C-alpha cells in the first residue's frame, strides 16, 4: 500500500471479455509474508483506469473472447475491497462457484434440449471488424435436434454406429441438465456451494466434445467447409475449431477434476 491506495502490478491471462468490461474482479496479494492462498485480498477494479491494459487473444476460430490483462502501478482504493483483508481466497472461490453454476444454468440446458432459439446466438454479434458473430457455444453445439436433422439430411441416421453416438450425446446432455437441476434445488434450499458447479462445467465440456465428434462422423470431410453452401452455414466447421475453448473457460477441466477429487472423493 502506498499512502491510502493499493498499487498493483501483475499479469492475468485467459480473462474472458476483459476488452469489453468496465469493471473487473481482482485477486491480489496484500501480505507478502503469508504463503499460497493466505494473504490474498479481493477487489473491484476499473478496467478503463490508467495502468490497466487489455490485449485480446485471437483464437483459431477467428474470435477473440479471451484476453491477457497487464496491471502496471494500477491504483485501487480500500473502498473497492470486497470482504476482509487477507480473506480474498474465500470470496474468489465463492464467486467462481456462482460463475460455473451460471454457465451451466438450468435455463441454458433447458432451451438447448428443446431447440429453442436460433442456431446462431444473435445477441453476441461482435462490433469490432476483426471479430465475427459466434455461431456456436457448448449448449447450442450439443443441440440434439440440429444433429438429428443433419443425420437425416445426409442419410447417416441409418448407420447404427451413428445412432449410438447420438444416443451417447443425448445421455450426456440429459446428465448436464439434471446436474443443473440439482444445483438449482440446492441453491433454493439455501445449502452452501458444493461441487455441482465443477460437475456442471465438466458436463458442458463433455457435451461440446461429444457434439464435435458426432458432427464430424455425420458430415465427414464436409465438416471442414465454411460459407453459405457448407453444412449448417459453416456452423459445424466453427464448432470443430471452437469446442476446445470449453475445456479452458470457467477454469480448466483439470482444475475442476482436482476440486472434485479434493472435496468429494478425498
Residue ranges of predicted features:
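A short core secondary-structure module
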Residues: 4-5, 9-57, 67
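Alpha-helical interface subdomain recognition
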Residues: 5, 98, 102-266
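Glycine-rich phosphate/pyrophosphate-binding beta-alpha loops
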Residues: 13-19, 60-61, 245-250
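Tryptophan-centric aromatic hotspots in well-structured domains and transmembrane helices
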Residues: 14, 23-25, 42, 66-70, ...
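Short Ser/Thr-interspersed hydrophobic loop/turn segments at strand-loop and sheet-helix junctions
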Residues: 27-28, 45-50, 73-75, 96, ...
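Flexible, small-/acidic-enriched active-site or ligand-binding loops
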Residues: 48-75, 84-90
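Long, acidic (Asp/Glu-rich), low-complexity accessory segments flanking structured domains
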Residues: 74-102, 108-109, 115
